[in-house]
Swiss-Prot record:
A motif (Mannose-binding) lies at residues 119-121. Belongs to the true venom lectin family. Mannose-binding lectin which recognizes specific carbohydrate structures and agglutinates a variety of animal cells by binding to cell-surface glycoproteins and glycolipids. May be a calcium-dependent lectin. Glycans are attached at N35, N109. Pfam families: Lectin_C (PF00059). This is C-type lectin lectoxin-Phi2. Ca(2+) binds at E127, N142, D143. The keyword 4Fe-4S does not apply. It comes from Philodryas olfersii (Green snake). PROSITE patterns: C_TYPE_LECTIN_1, C_TYPE_LECTIN_2.
Amino acid sequence: MGRFIFVSLGLLVLAFSLSGIGADQHCPSGWFSHNVSCYKLINDWKTWDEAQRFCMDEQENGQLASINDVGESVKLSDEFSKTWSIIDVWIGLRLSKRKSIWEWIDGSNVTQTRWEEGEPNNFLKKEFCVVLTSRSRYLKWNDKDCNRRHRFLCKF
């Protein structure tokens, strides 16, 4: 009897372990995960403010994505590269006009910067929002006019 319980328990543990392989268990359908966050690539063209509102409406606690470490950056690069190759993508970083510093929309600290060479340049003095650039395989940032339309990345 003891051996049967031990083997049954082992099979149960194995089944639960395998059920999580390749699945985003804690994310809704259409979203992918990295660590404890969920992400969704949105194929609509929106201004930065429109994209932020869309993310908030799409999912409770949704925001344009913050990117807080290199591992997260690499995961996002891999996901974007599967889908798009020549499209820049809004993320949740913008220049605070009040404080003149870059801030994540979700309030998390800017712990790293991944600017493309020569960026941010505030071209024509109206680039206050940030995209992941396709030419960098979505690893680097560029400041852009917030009123331009781009596809975007939501996170919760």
